[in-house]
Regions:
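Intrinsically disordered, low-complexity linker/assembly segments
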Residues: 1-94
Length: 94
């Protein structure tokens, strides 16, 4: 069993990492919980896309590699401030 949010693909452990839209577009760091129970921070390059991957050597099971696959952090509800900001982004063509 690969664990929650993880699956095996061609012998490599893949873990999905939920990343906020603003971090995908602008870059930044996100906290990642590793299979070992430890956590670390992943640097996300600006203009990243859902489905992009980063490999962490020796971070998987039995010191194997771990691929971190970016997924978009989907909000269940937006605040009025978030809606306002998104509307402004739409108005400038983003």
């Amino acid at each position: 069993d690969a664990g929650e949010g993880r699956h095996w693909e061609n012998g490599i452990l893949i873990q999905q990492v939920s990343i906020p839209y603003s971090t995908m577009m602008l870059g930044g760091k996100v906290k990642v919980n590793l299979p070992s129970g430890k956590s670390g921070f992943l640097s996300v390059a600006g203009n990243s896309q859902p489905g992009d991957r980063r490999r962490m050597s020796k971070a998987g099971y039995l010191q194997g590699d771990l691929d971190l696959e970016f997924i978009l952090d989907e909000q269940e509800e937006l605040t009025s401030e978030q809606i306002e900001v998104l509307e402004r982004l739409r108005d400038v063509g983003l």
